Amino acid sequence: MTERIVLAYSGGLDTSVAIGWIGEATGAEVIAVAVDVGQGGESLETIRQRALGCGAVEAYVADASDEFANEYCMPTLKANALYQGHYPLVSAISRPVIVKHLVKAAREFGATTVAHGCTGKGNDQVRFEVGIQTLGPDLKCIAPVRDLALTRDKAIAFAEEKGLPIETTKKNPYSIDQNVWGRAVETGYLEDIWNAPTKDIYDYTATPEFPPAPDEVIISFEAGVPVAIDGVRVTPLQAIKELNRRAGAQGVGRIDVVEDRLVGIKSREIYEAPGAMALITAHKHLEDITVEREQARFKATVGQRWSELVYDGQWFSPLKRSLDAFIEDTQKYVSGDIRMTLHGGQAVVNGRRSETSLYDFDLATYDTGDTFDQSMARGFIELWGMSAKVASGRDIRVAGK
Protein backbone atom coordinates (compact mmCIF):
# COMPACT_ATOMS: atom_id res chain seq x y z
CA MET A 1 0.00 0.00 0.00
CA THR A 2 1.31 3.44 -0.96
CA GLU A 3 2.34 5.59 2.00
CA ARG A 4 0.11 8.56 2.71
CA ILE A 5 1.22 11.92 4.09
CA VAL A 6 -1.11 14.55 5.53
CA LEU A 7 -0.05 18.13 4.72
CA ALA A 8 -1.11 21.26 6.59
CA TYR A 9 -2.38 23.22 3.59
CA SER A 10 -2.91 26.99 3.47
CA GLY A 11 -3.70 27.34 -0.22
CA GLY A 12 -0.64 29.50 -0.80
CA LEU A 13 2.39 28.99 -3.00
CA ASP A 14 4.63 27.06 -0.62
CA THR A 15 2.12 24.45 0.53
CA SER A 16 0.65 24.10 -2.98
CA VAL A 17 4.10 23.30 -4.33
CA ALA A 18 4.79 21.06 -1.33
CA ILE A 19 2.08 18.64 -2.51
CA GLY A 20 4.03 17.70 -5.64
CA TRP A 21 7.41 18.23 -4.03
CA ILE A 22 6.64 15.74 -1.25
CA GLY A 23 5.19 13.27 -3.74
CA GLU A 24 8.31 13.34 -5.91
CA ALA A 25 10.71 13.23 -2.95
CA THR A 26 8.98 10.40 -1.05
CA GLY A 27 6.72 8.59 -3.51
CA ALA A 28 3.84 9.05 -1.07
CA GLU A 29 0.28 10.18 -1.72
CA VAL A 30 -0.51 13.59 -0.21
CA ILE A 31 -3.73 14.52 1.59
CA ALA A 32 -4.12 18.29 1.94
CA VAL A 33 -5.71 19.56 5.16
CA ALA A 34 -7.06 23.12 5.28
CA VAL A 35 -8.49 24.52 8.52
CA ASP A 36 -10.52 27.73 8.70
CA VAL A 37 -9.71 29.63 11.90
CA GLY A 38 -11.36 32.82 10.75
CA GLN A 39 -8.53 34.00 8.51
CA GLY A 40 -10.91 35.23 5.81
CA GLY A 41 -10.01 35.30 2.14
CA GLU A 42 -10.83 32.40 -0.14
CA SER A 43 -13.58 29.89 0.51
CA LEU A 44 -12.72 26.43 1.76
CA GLU A 45 -14.12 24.92 -1.44
CA THR A 46 -11.78 27.07 -3.57
CA ILE A 47 -8.85 25.95 -1.45
CA ARG A 48 -9.98 22.31 -1.65
CA GLN A 49 -10.17 22.41 -5.44
CA ARG A 50 -6.72 24.03 -5.66
CA ALA A 51 -5.22 21.30 -3.50
CA LEU A 52 -6.69 18.64 -5.77
CA GLY A 53 -5.48 20.57 -8.82
CA CYS A 54 -1.95 20.61 -7.37
CA GLY A 55 -1.91 16.83 -7.03
CA ALA A 56 -3.43 15.97 -3.67
CA VAL A 57 -5.28 12.64 -3.73
CA GLU A 58 -7.67 13.89 -1.05
CA ALA A 59 -8.49 17.30 0.43
CA TYR A 60 -9.80 17.58 3.99
CA VAL A 61 -11.29 20.98 4.80
CA ALA A 62 -12.71 22.03 8.15
CA ASP A 63 -14.51 25.18 9.30
CA ALA A 64 -13.07 25.41 12.80
CA SER A 65 -13.77 29.11 13.34
CA ASP A 66 -16.31 28.59 16.15
CA GLU A 67 -14.20 25.86 17.69
CA PHE A 68 -11.17 28.16 17.57
CA ALA A 69 -13.05 31.04 19.18
CA ASN A 70 -14.66 28.92 21.91
CA GLU A 71 -11.86 26.53 22.84
CA TYR A 72 -8.71 28.53 22.08
CA CYS A 73 -9.44 32.27 22.04
CA MET A 74 -11.62 32.20 25.17
CA PRO A 75 -9.01 30.48 27.37
CA THR A 76 -6.52 33.05 26.09
CA LEU A 77 -8.90 35.84 27.06
CA LYS A 78 -9.56 34.37 30.52
CA ALA A 79 -5.80 34.25 31.09
CA ASN A 80 -5.37 37.87 29.86
CA ALA A 81 -2.56 36.25 27.90
CA LEU A 82 0.04 38.60 26.43
CA TYR A 83 3.41 36.99 25.76
CA GLN A 84 6.15 39.22 27.20
CA GLY A 85 3.44 41.73 28.00
CA HIS A 86 2.63 42.50 24.36
CA TYR A 87 1.67 39.61 22.08
CA PRO A 88 -1.86 38.13 22.33
CA LEU A 89 -0.65 34.77 20.93
CA VAL A 90 -2.32 35.22 17.54
CA SER A 91 -0.49 32.42 15.70
CA ALA A 92 0.43 30.37 18.76
CA ILE A 93 -3.16 29.52 19.70
CA SER A 94 -4.18 28.58 16.15
CA ARG A 95 -1.56 25.85 15.82
CA PRO A 96 -3.10 23.43 18.36
CA VAL A 97 -6.50 23.43 16.63
CA ILE A 98 -4.81 22.87 13.26
CA VAL A 99 -2.78 20.04 14.79
CA LYS A 100 -5.98 18.49 16.14
CA HIS A 101 -7.46 18.36 12.64
CA LEU A 102 -4.20 17.15 11.07
CA VAL A 103 -4.14 14.17 13.42
CA LYS A 104 -7.85 13.55 12.85
CA ALA A 105 -7.29 13.55 9.07
CA ALA A 106 -4.29 11.25 9.40
CA ARG A 107 -6.47 8.71 11.20
CA GLU A 108 -9.32 9.11 8.73
CA PHE A 109 -7.16 8.64 5.63
CA GLY A 110 -4.66 6.13 7.00
CA ALA A 111 -1.64 8.44 6.85
CA THR A 112 1.58 7.65 8.70
CA THR A 113 3.24 11.06 8.38
CA VAL A 114 2.23 14.69 8.86
CA ALA A 115 3.91 17.52 6.94
CA HIS A 116 3.92 21.26 7.58
CA GLY A 117 5.37 24.27 5.77
CA CYS A 118 7.40 25.81 8.59
CA THR A 119 11.02 26.90 8.36
CA GLY A 120 13.78 25.81 10.72
CA LYS A 121 14.05 29.26 12.34
CA GLY A 122 10.52 29.79 13.60
CA ASN A 123 8.38 28.80 16.54
CA ASP A 124 5.68 27.08 14.49
CA GLN A 125 7.78 24.02 13.65
CA VAL A 126 7.93 23.32 17.39
CA ARG A 127 4.23 24.01 17.94
CA PHE A 128 3.20 21.68 15.13
CA GLU A 129 5.56 18.83 15.88
CA VAL A 130 5.21 18.84 19.67
CA GLY A 131 1.43 18.92 19.24
CA ILE A 132 1.50 16.06 16.73
CA GLN A 133 3.80 14.01 18.97
CA THR A 134 1.36 14.54 21.84
CA LEU A 135 -1.90 13.75 20.02
CA GLY A 136 -0.45 11.20 17.58
CA PRO A 137 2.79 9.80 19.01
CA ASP A 138 2.97 7.13 16.30
CA LEU A 139 2.94 9.72 13.49
CA LYS A 140 6.12 10.96 11.82
CA CYS A 141 6.66 14.63 10.90
CA ILE A 142 8.39 16.21 7.93
CA ALA A 143 8.87 19.85 6.99
CA PRO A 144 9.61 20.33 3.26
CA VAL A 145 10.89 23.90 3.62
CA ARG A 146 13.21 22.85 6.43
CA ASP A 147 14.02 19.22 5.55
CA LEU A 148 13.81 19.15 1.75
CA ALA A 149 15.37 22.58 1.06
CA LEU A 150 12.22 23.99 -0.55
CA THR A 151 13.10 27.67 -0.98
CA ARG A 152 10.70 30.26 -2.39
CA ASP A 153 12.69 30.51 -5.64
CA LYS A 154 12.51 26.74 -6.03
CA ALA A 155 8.80 26.81 -5.24
CA ILE A 156 8.12 29.38 -7.97
CA ALA A 157 10.19 27.44 -10.51
CA PHE A 158 8.46 24.17 -9.61
CA ALA A 159 4.98 25.71 -9.87
CA GLU A 160 5.74 27.20 -13.28
CA GLU A 161 7.33 23.99 -14.56
CA LYS A 162 4.34 21.89 -13.48
CA GLY A 163 1.72 24.46 -14.46
CA LEU A 164 0.16 24.44 -11.01
CA PRO A 165 -3.05 26.48 -10.51
CA ILE A 166 -1.42 28.95 -8.11
CA GLU A 167 -0.16 32.52 -8.46
CA THR A 168 3.63 32.76 -8.50
CA THR A 169 5.10 36.07 -7.46
CA LYS A 170 8.03 37.53 -5.56
CA LYS A 171 6.21 40.83 -4.95
CA ASN A 172 5.21 40.43 -1.33
CA PRO A 173 8.29 40.55 0.91
CA TYR A 174 6.38 39.78 4.10
CA SER A 175 5.45 36.61 5.90
CA ILE A 176 1.82 37.00 7.03
CA ASP A 177 -0.31 34.78 9.24
CA GLN A 178 -3.83 35.70 10.25
CA ASN A 179 -6.94 34.39 11.93
CA VAL A 180 -9.95 35.89 13.70
CA TRP A 181 -7.87 36.63 16.84
CA GLY A 182 -5.38 38.77 14.92
CA ARG A 183 -2.77 39.16 12.23
CA ALA A 184 1.04 38.73 12.31
CA VAL A 185 3.50 40.28 9.85
CA GLU A 186 7.26 39.71 9.75
CA THR A 187 10.41 39.62 7.54
CA GLY A 188 11.21 41.93 4.65
CA TYR A 189 12.38 45.42 5.57
CA LEU A 190 10.93 44.94 9.08
CA GLU A 191 13.99 42.85 9.92
CA ASP A 192 15.88 46.14 10.32
CA ILE A 193 14.39 47.08 13.69
CA TRP A 194 15.04 50.79 13.09
CA ASN A 195 12.66 50.83 10.11
CA ALA A 196 9.18 52.09 10.95
CA PRO A 197 6.25 50.05 9.60
CA THR A 198 4.64 51.50 6.49
CA LYS A 199 0.88 51.82 6.11
CA ASP A 200 0.68 49.08 3.49
CA ILE A 201 1.42 46.28 5.97
CA TYR A 202 -1.80 46.86 7.94
CA ASP A 203 -5.10 45.24 7.04
CA TYR A 204 -7.16 44.73 10.22
CA THR A 205 -6.72 48.29 11.50
CA ALA A 206 -7.24 51.80 10.13
CA THR A 207 -4.70 54.57 10.69
CA PRO A 208 -5.23 55.75 14.30
CA GLU A 209 -3.97 59.26 13.54
CA PHE A 210 -7.14 60.01 11.57
CA PRO A 211 -9.90 58.19 13.44
CA PRO A 212 -13.65 58.53 12.97
CA ALA A 213 -15.82 59.80 15.83
CA PRO A 214 -15.33 57.99 19.16
CA ASP A 215 -17.21 54.69 19.41
CA GLU A 216 -18.63 53.77 22.82
CA VAL A 217 -19.32 50.08 23.35
CA ILE A 218 -20.67 48.02 26.25
CA ILE A 219 -19.31 44.46 26.50
CA SER A 220 -21.16 42.03 28.76
CA PHE A 221 -19.40 39.01 30.26
CA GLU A 222 -20.56 35.83 31.98
CA ALA A 223 -17.90 33.82 33.83
CA GLY A 224 -15.16 35.55 31.84
CA VAL A 225 -16.74 35.04 28.40
CA PRO A 226 -18.20 37.89 26.31
CA VAL A 227 -21.90 37.18 25.79
CA ALA A 228 -23.34 40.49 24.55
CA ILE A 229 -22.28 43.70 22.85
CA ASP A 230 -24.46 46.74 23.42
CA GLY A 231 -27.14 44.43 24.78
CA VAL A 232 -27.21 42.13 21.75
CA ARG A 233 -26.37 38.50 22.53
CA VAL A 234 -23.31 37.16 20.71
CA THR A 235 -21.21 34.02 20.51
CA PRO A 236 -17.48 34.31 21.23
CA LEU A 237 -16.77 34.29 17.48
CA GLN A 238 -19.32 37.04 16.86
CA ALA A 239 -17.90 39.11 19.72
CA ILE A 240 -14.38 38.91 18.31
CA LYS A 241 -15.53 39.74 14.78
CA GLU A 242 -17.65 42.70 15.92
CA LEU A 243 -14.81 44.16 17.94
CA ASN A 244 -12.36 43.50 15.12
CA ARG A 245 -14.61 45.69 13.00
CA ARG A 246 -15.26 48.46 15.51
CA ALA A 247 -11.91 48.57 17.28
CA GLY A 248 -10.09 48.06 13.99
CA ALA A 249 -11.83 51.10 12.50
CA GLN A 250 -10.31 53.13 15.37
CA GLY A 251 -6.78 51.76 14.90
CA VAL A 252 -6.89 49.77 18.14
CA GLY A 253 -4.57 46.79 18.54
CA ARG A 254 -1.44 47.68 16.57
CA ILE A 255 1.65 46.13 18.18
CA ASP A 256 5.28 46.58 17.09
CA VAL A 257 7.58 44.42 19.20
CA VAL A 258 10.86 42.53 19.27
CA GLU A 259 10.17 39.24 21.02
CA ASP A 260 12.19 36.26 22.18
CA ARG A 261 11.54 33.26 19.98
CA LEU A 262 11.57 29.75 21.35
CA VAL A 263 14.54 28.85 19.11
CA GLY A 264 16.77 31.40 20.85
CA ILE A 265 16.71 34.41 18.54
CA LYS A 266 14.99 37.77 18.85
CA SER A 267 12.50 38.60 16.12
CA ARG A 268 10.72 41.80 15.13
CA GLU A 269 6.97 41.29 14.69
CA ILE A 270 4.06 43.52 13.75
CA TYR A 271 0.69 42.43 15.08
CA GLU A 272 -2.85 43.64 14.56
CA ALA A 273 -5.36 42.37 17.10
CA PRO A 274 -8.14 44.93 17.51
CA GLY A 275 -10.80 42.57 18.83
CA ALA A 276 -8.41 40.63 21.02
CA MET A 277 -6.87 43.71 22.63
CA ALA A 278 -10.25 45.37 23.22
CA LEU A 279 -11.59 42.19 24.83
CA ILE A 280 -8.50 41.62 26.98
CA THR A 281 -8.65 45.23 28.18
CA ALA A 282 -12.34 44.93 29.05
CA HIS A 283 -11.91 41.53 30.71
CA LYS A 284 -9.00 42.73 32.84
CA HIS A 285 -11.01 45.71 34.09
CA LEU A 286 -13.93 43.45 34.99
CA GLU A 287 -11.56 41.17 36.90
CA ASP A 288 -10.32 44.23 38.81
CA ILE A 289 -13.71 44.51 40.53
CA THR A 290 -14.69 40.83 40.77
CA VAL A 291 -11.53 38.87 41.63
CA GLU A 292 -10.17 38.90 45.20
CA ARG A 293 -6.85 40.70 45.66
CA GLU A 294 -4.51 37.78 46.47
CA GLN A 295 -6.14 35.61 43.83
CA ALA A 296 -5.71 38.40 41.28
CA ARG A 297 -2.04 38.90 42.14
CA PHE A 298 -1.29 35.22 41.74
CA LYS A 299 -3.38 34.98 38.58
CA ALA A 300 -1.14 37.59 36.93
CA THR A 301 1.83 35.28 37.51
CA VAL A 302 -0.13 32.27 36.27
CA GLY A 303 -1.24 34.17 33.17
CA GLN A 304 2.34 35.07 32.32
CA ARG A 305 3.48 31.46 32.65
CA TRP A 306 0.43 30.29 30.68
CA SER A 307 1.41 32.66 27.86
CA GLU A 308 4.95 31.32 27.81
CA LEU A 309 3.77 27.71 27.67
CA VAL A 310 1.40 28.40 24.78
CA TYR A 311 4.00 30.46 22.91
CA ASP A 312 6.48 27.62 23.37
CA GLY A 313 4.16 25.00 21.86
CA GLN A 314 3.02 23.42 25.13
CA TRP A 315 -0.74 23.77 24.64
CA PHE A 316 -1.31 20.09 25.42
CA SER A 317 1.14 19.90 28.35
CA PRO A 318 0.17 18.78 31.88
CA LEU A 319 1.31 22.10 33.38
CA LYS A 320 -0.78 24.13 30.97
CA ARG A 321 -3.77 21.92 31.76
CA SER A 322 -3.25 22.53 35.49
CA LEU A 323 -2.99 26.28 34.95
CA ASP A 324 -6.21 26.12 32.92
CA ALA A 325 -7.97 24.69 35.96
CA PHE A 326 -6.76 27.52 38.20
CA ILE A 327 -7.67 30.22 35.68
CA GLU A 328 -11.12 28.72 35.15
CA ASP A 329 -11.75 28.78 38.90
CA THR A 330 -10.93 32.51 39.01
CA GLN A 331 -13.62 33.25 36.43
CA LYS A 332 -16.56 32.14 38.59
CA TYR A 333 -17.57 35.73 39.44
CA VAL A 334 -16.19 37.54 36.37
CA SER A 335 -19.62 38.59 35.13
CA GLY A 336 -20.89 42.06 34.38
CA ASP A 337 -20.63 44.95 31.94
CA ILE A 338 -17.69 47.05 30.80
CA ARG A 339 -18.19 50.32 28.96
CA MET A 340 -15.28 51.47 26.84
CA THR A 341 -14.56 54.14 24.27
CA LEU A 342 -12.70 53.16 21.11
CA HIS A 343 -10.85 56.07 19.56
CA GLY A 344 -7.49 57.01 18.09
CA GLY A 345 -5.81 53.66 18.65
CA GLN A 346 -6.99 53.35 22.25
CA ALA A 347 -9.61 51.23 24.01
CA VAL A 348 -10.33 53.18 27.19
CA VAL A 349 -12.59 51.77 29.90
CA ASN A 350 -14.82 54.40 31.51
CA GLY A 351 -17.46 52.33 33.28
CA ARG A 352 -17.93 48.98 34.95
CA ARG A 353 -20.76 47.23 36.81
CA SER A 354 -21.30 43.76 38.21
CA GLU A 355 -23.69 42.01 40.58
CA THR A 356 -20.69 40.02 41.85
CA SER A 357 -18.44 43.06 42.34
CA LEU A 358 -16.16 43.31 45.37
CA TYR A 359 -16.22 47.09 45.11
CA ASP A 360 -18.18 48.41 48.10
CA PHE A 361 -19.17 52.06 47.63
CA ASP A 362 -19.89 52.56 51.33
CA LEU A 363 -16.41 51.34 52.24
CA ALA A 364 -14.62 53.20 49.44
CA THR A 365 -16.30 56.62 49.63
CA TYR A 366 -14.62 59.56 51.37
CA ASP A 367 -17.98 61.26 51.89
CA THR A 368 -19.88 61.46 55.15
CA GLY A 369 -21.55 58.20 56.11
CA ASP A 370 -18.82 55.85 54.94
CA THR A 371 -18.69 52.49 56.75
CA PHE A 372 -14.89 52.14 56.86
CA ASP A 373 -13.73 52.21 60.50
CA GLN A 374 -10.55 54.30 60.29
CA SER A 375 -9.77 53.65 63.96
CA MET A 376 -8.57 50.19 62.94
CA ALA A 377 -5.81 51.62 60.74
CA ARG A 378 -3.27 52.41 63.49
CA GLY A 379 -3.16 48.88 64.87
CA PHE A 380 -3.10 47.40 61.39
CA ILE A 381 -0.09 49.53 60.44
CA GLU A 382 1.78 48.52 63.60
CA LEU A 383 1.28 44.84 62.84
CA TRP A 384 1.93 45.19 59.10
CA GLY A 385 5.22 46.96 59.66
CA MET A 386 6.39 44.83 62.60
CA SER A 387 8.68 42.55 60.59
CA ALA A 388 10.45 45.45 58.85
CA LYS A 389 10.73 47.35 62.14
CA VAL A 390 12.36 44.41 63.93
CA ALA A 391 14.78 43.82 61.03
CA SER A 392 15.74 47.50 60.96
CA GLY A 393 16.42 47.40 64.70
CA ARG A 394 18.77 44.48 64.18
CA ASP A 395 20.64 46.35 61.41
CA ILE A 396 21.14 49.35 63.69
CA ARG A 397 22.28 47.13 66.57
CA VAL A 398 24.79 45.18 64.46
CA ALA A 399 26.14 48.32 62.77
CA GLY A 400 26.79 49.90 66.17
CA LYS A 401 29.07 47.12 67.36
From Swiss-Prot:
One GO cellular component, as annotated: cytoplasm
Disulfide bond residue pairs: none
GO molecular-function term, one example from the UniProt record: argininosuccinate synthase activity
Subcellular location: Cytoplasm
Binding site residues for L-citrulline: Y87, N123, R127, S175, E259, Y271
Pathway terms, separated by semicolons: Amino-acid biosynthesis; L-arginine biosynthesis; L-arginine from L-ornithine and carbamoyl phosphate: step 2/3
Residues that bind ATP: A8, Y9, S10, G11, G12, L13, D14, T15, S16, G117
Subunit-level organization: Homotetramer.
Name this polypeptide is given: Argininosuccinate synthase
